[in-house]
UniProtKB/Swiss-Prot annotation:
InterPro entries: SOD-like_Cu/Zn_dom_sf, SOD_Cu/Zn_/chaperone. The keyword Disulfide bond applies. One of its GO terms (molecular function) is copper ion binding. PANTHER family: SUPEROXIDE DISMUTASE CU-ZN -RELATED (PTHR10003). Keywords: Disulfide bond, Host cytoplasm, Virion. This is Cu-Zn superoxide dismutase-like protein OPG175. GO terms for cellular component: host cell cytoplasm; virion component. It comes from Monkeypox virus.
Amino acid sequence: MAVCIIDHDNIRGVIYVEQVHGKDKVLGSVIGLKSGTYSLIIHRYGDISRGCDSIGSPEIFIGNIFVNRYGVAYVYLDTDVNISTIIGKALSISKNDQRLACGVIGISYINEKIIHFLTINENGV
């Protein structure tokens, strides 16, 4: 399982890439964006030393997410991404080719008995 922590200005979230019932899925939630549609994109580098300006060119479009009127996006997307090929790269949340937030994709601890899914209510809790 891979995980990406997003924490940029007021935009925060956790995105996982994992197998669910034998299929690869992108799961998670993000808060702090305005209502609308945004893109999840994997970039060449995991270098966030200059924020999203140093993550390199886009490589893989994962899919679109919808942010509700409370500023919350719940992510549940199918993907054919090979998890081992994205470790160490960056994931961005973008709109109109503008990178709004990003994080580095890392290896996540796998707990076979319990998988916690981050949920956030309209109050950000």
